[in-house]
From Swiss-Prot:
One matching Pfam family: DUF1189
Location(s), subcellular: Cell membrane
UniProt lineage: Bacteria, Bacillati, Bacillota, Bacilli, Bacillales
Intrachain disulfide bonds: none
Protein name as catalogued: Putative maltodextrin utilization protein YvdJ
Gene: yvdJ
GO cellular component: plasma membrane
Predominant cellular place of this UniProt entry's protein: membrane
Keywords of this entry: Cell membrane, Membrane, Transmembrane, Transmembrane helix
Organism this protein belongs to: Bacillus subtilis (strain 168)
Task performed by this protein: Could have a role in maltodextrin utilization.
Coiled-coil regions, chain positions: none
Residue intervals passing through the bilayer: 35-55, 184-204, 228-248, 249-269
Length: 294
């Protein structure tokens, strides 16, 4: 053990991540501080393709969480937006100010702030309507009957709506929404990845540590179990990150990582049980020889 601990931290990390046997051999050579660093590093690796994907993303499908509001966009409303432009965070130009109201649905260009809103952002409501898409001079208000609603600023975009169609309007809404809420989406995605990584590590470490009760494996402490769980996730994390860089899909990345960690832990557990069995046979054989000599 001393010889293993004398090796540099990087060498131990590489050897621990290379194979299930390395995971077991070097599992007890890391301190809690080093394990924390490894955990954060591997979590960052999983987040790398996510960050690259967000950098490339220029719009987010609002219809995925506000379907009823977006489905209401039609050619008549697209024609109303003809001639308007967004510049320096303001909506200007255009001539039409007709409202399209149908029961609890409304779509309008409201240059005089005639529609009243209530509630906080994310749960915003337009008084008297469930589904609303309202372009105002300084913001876009969009609400859905599922009680989701946002006010979206125009940021510093430079857009001129010459002959917009339904698709152009949907793309504009998607682009405006992402420009304002991209940091929120990124933070939410990072939190999900971190929590899944933490939960997976804790469950695997706890499972390994519990096997100590049955004497199936020779794990001395919870730290060693946590070390094995973290080191076993290194190779799957690198593989998931590499695949995510080529073609990103959050669910695919998490599945590759989770399945890979499970396989590595299975092989490591097999190695531990085999090592314990071999050691037991050696001790048993030694006692038999000693008895025979006596």
């Amino acid at each position: 053990m001393k010889n293993l601990e004398n090796k540099s931290f990087i060498i131990r990390c590489l050897k621990a991540a290379a194979s299930p046997s390395g995971v077991c051999r070097y599992g007890n050579t890391f301190s809690w501080l080093q394990l924390s660093f490894l955990f954060l590093f591997l979590t960052a690796c999983l987040m790398a393709p996510l960050a690259v994907s967000f950098v490339k993303m220029d719009r987010f499908s609002v219809s995925s969480f506000m379907p009823s509001a977006i489905q209401g966009v039609n050619d008549q409303f697209a024609d109303q937006l003809q001639g308007f432009q967004i510049r320096n965070g303001k909506l200007t130009g255009g001539k039409s100010s007709e409202r399209i109201e149908d029961g609890q649905n409304v779509m309008a260009v409201d240059m005089k702030h005639e529609y009243e809103t209530s509630g906080e952002n994310g749960r915003l409501k337009v008084t008297g309507f469930e589904n609303a898409i309202i372009f105002q001079p300084d913001q876009l208000v969009i609400t859905d009957q599922n009680e989701t609603g946002f006010s979206v600023g125009y940021a510093k975009m430079d857009v001129k709506l010459e002959k917009p169609n339904v698709h152009d309007v949907e793309v504009l809404i998607d682009t405006l929404w992402l420009a304002q809420y991209k940091p929120m989406i990124m933070m939410l995605a990072y939190t999900v990845v971190s929590m899944i990584q933490l939960l997976l590590t804790f469950v695997l470490a706890g499972g390994l540590w519990i096997t100590k009760i049955s004497n199936m494996v020779s794990i001395a402490s919870f730290k060693e179990a946590a070390s094995i769980a973290i080191c076993a996730s290194a190779l799957p994390a690198f593989a998931a990150a590499a695949i995510g860089m080529v073609h990103f899909d959050l669910i695919t990345v998490l599945m590759i990582h989770s399945c890979g960690v499970t396989l590595m832990i299975s092989f490591a557990f097999r190695y531990l049980t085999k090592t314990r069995r071999d050691n037991g046979n050696l001790h048993s054989g030694g006692n038999d020889d000693k008895s025979a000599v006596i």
